[in-house]
Amino acid sequence: MTPSNEPGKQDQIPQPGPTIPNQYSFLWLSAAIFLMFLWLQGNNQQQQQELAYSEFKQAVISGQVAEVTLRTEEISGSFTDSGASRFANDSRPPSSSFITLRPQVEDPELLPLLERQEVLVRGSRSGRPWWQELILGFLPWILLLALMFWFWGAAQKRMTQGGGPFDYGKSRARRARRETSTTTLDDVAGIESAKRDISEIIDFLKSPDKYRRLGAVMPKGVLLVGPPGTGKTLLARAIAGEAEVPFFSISASEFIEMFVGVGAARVRDMFQTARKEAPALIFIDELDAVGRSRGAGLGGGHDEREQTLNQILTEMDGFEAHENVLVLAATNRPDVLDTALLRPGRFDRKITLDRPHREAREAILKVHVRKVPLAADVDLTQVAARTTGFSGADLKNLVNEAALTAARDNLVEVNNHCFEVAHDRLILGEERDAQLTPEEREAVAYHECGHAIMAYYMPKADPLTKITIIPHGMAMGVTEQTPKEDKYNYTESYLEDRIKVMLGGRSAEKIIYGEVSTGAQNDLKEATKLLRRMVGQWGMSEKIGPLGLGIGEEHVFLGREMGAPREYSEKLAEMIDSEIQSQLLAFEAFTVSFLTEHRQELDALARAVMKRETLSAGEITEVLEEARSRETA
């Protein structure tokens, strides 16, 4: 079956060939007039030898002038065959014609001289023809005034109806065509519930009668919500490849332009275009760029972004039931969106795309390795287990980094080692050369082993994956832990053990050297931040009590107010600070005491790390078990 015979494919209707936009017609006309002006100038300034008046008379006396044309201010004429080359030089190219200026004092001997030499004498009106004088005199002013009126009219048109010579008011929405789209729903994995919702909406657009018979009404809008990299835009691209209806896509930032009113004009134009081709889909990416809550204190009702938002609200609320135009939008900041956007009747349905769980990560990896030759030792289940917290975009980047590693090593297949190297590069950072002194290297080893001992023995801590003292990124060494399974709720005991692991490096330095270094700076920062949230946000302190004060939240600009007000007193703030300090000191004391009791394991593990630089989970267990057996012997 040929594409032209397939039903429902409106996007395959032949399109007319390219035409010159009407707004450029005036520019082409102006260019043509300018070229004609240059041609007229050129015709009046043909190549002629310029002679001094005395040279002209000498040429006449020598019989080298064939004819002349007398004018008020100049004399032009032509040479005989012998005279054309007499006056030629480097600055005067040879020419059969000449021109000379007449002196202001009349020469009574000129005409008798010309008659004696039998030179043909012609008379001529002075200056150019009248029509040339008229054109050359008025043409520059005509062009200038025409350009001024053109730009003035264009600006008025932009302000009133969104048009203009440069299409400022035209929508920047791009129409996706099925035959050019390379992404389908088969390329989207790990978000099956979202795919079902989207498939239902596409089916509604293609077969609305099936739903209308049951009294169902199509949603006006669908909002895709989720962290960056979870597949919102990918899902939209897949819809463009699957839908048998016109699909228009645009980024919300493309509505805003340097001219006032352009954003609202582009919104109107986009919806008008979609209505003409209904049923249709409109996809707006990064909706929060124009959909932030109004009245944020940055600009009033004249704010261009607010005008654009108001126009979107009007267009969506103005839909009729029979229009069959659906708005699909994506954002990773639903908290900043205006409440008018989120009410029923505009974005009726919200689809949440979260970071994938283990099975979903494995499904996503299988999609991304379709074109990647894998070695037999690659186990995608293990790769998925090790990539807790990775988004779909992170997993795609992981596969690509593994393929780059294999190509760098001149391998024909991507093996498990390539995935390990890629994982370390993404999580730990690129390996770098750092010239550490033996003392610094030993200090880094004890620091990382302090983390490792606490992670190994704390019952709620995440299992160890590796220890390395090879510098990665900005870190001199890394102790890596991987959760056994995805976590969605964190218990108080788990968080306490996590803080103890963070303080293990600093405590090990204090035990071995009697002082601490700056290497624990980030550990202290993260431990304090976590404990502040436990005390002030999650109510995990008996002294403060079950109060959710929002302390520790990362207050970003929410679009509604410049900063969150503090909902507790100065006295309570002092109590919270005191509680955080006392708990950190207690955790540090416990960690120092625990590592002191396991000093032999700490020394053995540090020696092994300094010798091998990197230890896997199995090697760590082997070293610690051997040290413990020697201690009990």
Swiss-Prot record:
Alphabetized Gene3D superfamilies for the sequence: 1.10.8.60, 3.30.720.210, P-loop containing nucleotide triphosphate hydrolases, Peptidase M41
Enzyme class: hydrolase
A single Gene Ontology CC term: plasma membrane
Enzyme Commission number(s) of this protein: 3.4.24.-
Location relative to the cell: Cell inner membrane
Residues in the Periplasmic compartment per record: 41-133
Cofactor note: Binds 1 zinc ion per subunit.
Protein's membrane topology: Multi-pass membrane protein
Entry superkingdom: Bacteria
Record GO biological process: protein catabolic process; proteolysis
Residue ranges crossing the lipid bilayer per the database entry: 20-40, 134-154
Active site per the UniProt annotation: 448
Obligatory cofactor(s): Zn(2+)
MF-aspect GO terms: ATP binding; ATP hydrolysis activity; ATP-dependent peptidase activity; metalloendopeptidase activity; zinc ion binding
Similarity annotation: In the central section; belongs to the AAA ATPase family.
Function: Acts as a processive, ATP-dependent zinc metallopeptidase for both cytoplasmic and membrane proteins. Plays a role in the quality control of integral membrane proteins.
UniProt cross-references to PANTHER family, sorted A to Z: ATP-DEPENDENT ZINC METALLOPROTEASE YME1L1, METALLOPROTEASE M41 FTSH
Protein name: ATP-dependent zinc metalloprotease FtsH
Organism: Marinobacter nauticus (strain ATCC 700491 / DSM 11845 / VT8)
